[in-house]
C-alpha cells in the first residue's frame, strides 16, 4: 500500500505546507509507510494506483483543487484526502478533508472582539482564490458581520489597506484571515491607532514580530497524523464517500489586544427556548407523511402483515386465522397502530395508508 502526495505549487512555498508535510513524513518514519511525492500533474495522470492506495492533496486554491480532485477521484475513488484549511464545496465529489475548525475559530474571535466592546468588526485580507478564506468569510457573515465589512486582498495587501483606511473610523475591531495580513496591517497603521486586531491563522513569523498578534494557533504537523488515521476508515469502508476532520485550535492573546484573555464562558441561569424557523416540518402534508413513515418504520413483520390484510379488506376473523391470533388480539394490535399513526379508527388508518398506496 502506497500513500501519494501532491501539493499546490504556490502553496508549497508557504510554511503551512512545509509543516503539514513535515508531520506526514514524521508519521511515515514512525509507522514505516511507503510515501511517494508526485512532482506535478503529469506524474498524477500517468499513475496506476493499487486498490488500497491513498492520495493526500495539500493546498487551498479553489481552481487548483477543482482540477486535481477530479483527476484524483478517477484514480483513487473515495481515497482522496485534502490536507489544509479547506471549505468543501465540490458537491458530488468523493474526497475527504482534514482542516482547522475555521467556523469555530472565527466565531471565537468575533465573540472575543465583541467582549472587548467592538461594535462593528471588519474581516481583513480575504483571498478570493482561497477556499479557506471563503469559509472564514461565510463564518464571519453568520456571526453578524456584513458584506460591506469584508476587505479582500487581490494580490496587494497595500491596496487592501488603502481600501480599509477609507472606512477605518467606522470599525472597533478587525479580524485578519492570517498572521501575514495582521502583520501587514499593523505595519501600515499609525502607531497611535490602537484598534484591537486578531488573526485566524498563525505563522512562525508572528512569533518574532512585535507587537505580538492575538489569534488562533494550530499545530499543522497534526494534519498528517489525522490524514493517515482517516485513510484507514476509507480503506476499510468502501461505502464511505467522505469524512471531514476538524482539528482544534487554541486561542493565544497577544499585544494587539493588550494581552486580554477570552472572557469566561457563562452558563445561562434560565433554560433557553430555541424555536425552529423551518416551516418545512409544519406543512400538514409533511406532518402526515412523517406519521406514516414513523408507523411503518416501527412495525414488526407481523404488524406489516396485519396492515396489508386490513388494506385488502379482510375481516378480523380472517386476519386472526392467518396470523394465528384471536380477534381481541387483532383489535389490541390495531389500537396500538392507530395510536402510533395518530388515527382514531380502523377506517381512518386504512384511509391514511391508502393515500400513499402503501402495499
Give the positions of each predicted feature.
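Hydrophobic alpha-helical segments within soluble ligand-binding/sensing domains
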Residues: 87, 94-123, 157-162, 182, ...
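An alpha-beta-alpha
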Residues: 107-147, 243-259
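Short, basic, alpha-helical segments at the C-terminal edge of helix-turn-helix-like DNA-binding modules
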Residues: 343-359
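Short helix-coil-helix linker/hinge
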Residues: 296-303
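Flexible loop/turn connectors
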Residues: 94-95, 166-173, 180-268
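Short, Lys/Arg-enriched N-terminal segment that forms or immediately precedes the first helix
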Residues: 284-295
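Alpha-helical recognition/docking segments in bacterial nutrient-uptake
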Residues: 1-111, 165-169, 173
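Recognition helix of helix-turn-helix DNA-binding domains
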Residues: 313-348
Amino acid at each position: 500500500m502506497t500513500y501519494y502526495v501532491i501539493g499546490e505549487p504556490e502553496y508549497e512555498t508557504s510554511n503551512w505546507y512545509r509543516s503539514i508535510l513535515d508531520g506526514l513524513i514524521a508519521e511515515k518514519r514512525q509507522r514505516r509507510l511507503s510515501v511517494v511525492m508526485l512532482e506535478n500533474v503529469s506524474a498524477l495522470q500517468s499513475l496506476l494506483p493499487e486498490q488500497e492506495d491513498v492520495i493526500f492533496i495539500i493546498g487551498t486554491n479553489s481552481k487548483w483543487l477543482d482540477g486535481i480532485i477530479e483527476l484524483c477521484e478517477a484514480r483513487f475513488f473515495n481515497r482522496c484526502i485534502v490536507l489544509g484549511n479547506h471549505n468543501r464545496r465540490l458537491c458530488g465529489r468523493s474526497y475527504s478533508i482534514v482542516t482547522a475548525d475555521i467556523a469555530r475559530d472565527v466565531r471565537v474571535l468575533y465573540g472575543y472582539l465583541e467582549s472587548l466592546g467592538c461594535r462593528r468588526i471588519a474581516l481583513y485580507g480575504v483571498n478570493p482564490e482561497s477556499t479557506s478564506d471563503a469559509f472564514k468569510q461565510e463564518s464571519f457573515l453568520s456571526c453578524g458581520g456584513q458584506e460591506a465589512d469584508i476587505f479582500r486582498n487581490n494580490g496587494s495587501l497595500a491596496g487592501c489597506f488603502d481600501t480599509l483606511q477609507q472606512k477605518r473610523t467606522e470599525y472597533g475591531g478587525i479580524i485578519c484571515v492570517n498572521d501575514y495580513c495582521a502583520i501587514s496591517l499593523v505595519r501600515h497603521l499609525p502607531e497611535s491607532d490602537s484598534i484591537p486586531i486578531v488573526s485566524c491563522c498563525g505563522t512562525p513569523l508572528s512569533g518574532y514580530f512585535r507587537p505580538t498578534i492575538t489569534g488562533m494557533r494550530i499545530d499543522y504537523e497534526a494534519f498528517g497524523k489525522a490524514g493517515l488515521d482517516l485513510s484507514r476508515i476509507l480503506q476499510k469502508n468502501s461505502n464511505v464517500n467522505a469524512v471531514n476532520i476538524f482539528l482544534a485550535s487554541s486561542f493565544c492573546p497577544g499585544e494587539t489586544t493588550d494581552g486580554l484573555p477570552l472572557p469566561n464562558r457563562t452558563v445561562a441561569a434560565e433554560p433557553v427556548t430555541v424555536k425552529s424557523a423551518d416551516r418545512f416540518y409544519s406543512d400538514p402534508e409533511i406532518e402526515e407523511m412523517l406519521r406514516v413513515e414513523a408507523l411503518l418504520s416501527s412495525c414488526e413483520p407481523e404488524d406489516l402483515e396485519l396492515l396489508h390484510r386490513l388494506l385488502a379488506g379482510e375481516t378480523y376473523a380472517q386476519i386472526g386465522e392467518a396470523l394465528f391470533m384471536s380477534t381481541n388480539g387483532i383489535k389490541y394490535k390495531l389500537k396500538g397502530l392507530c395510536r402510533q399513526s395518530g388515527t382514531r379508527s380502523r377506517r381512518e388508518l386504512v384511509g391514511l395508508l391508502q393515500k400513499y398506496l402503501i402495499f
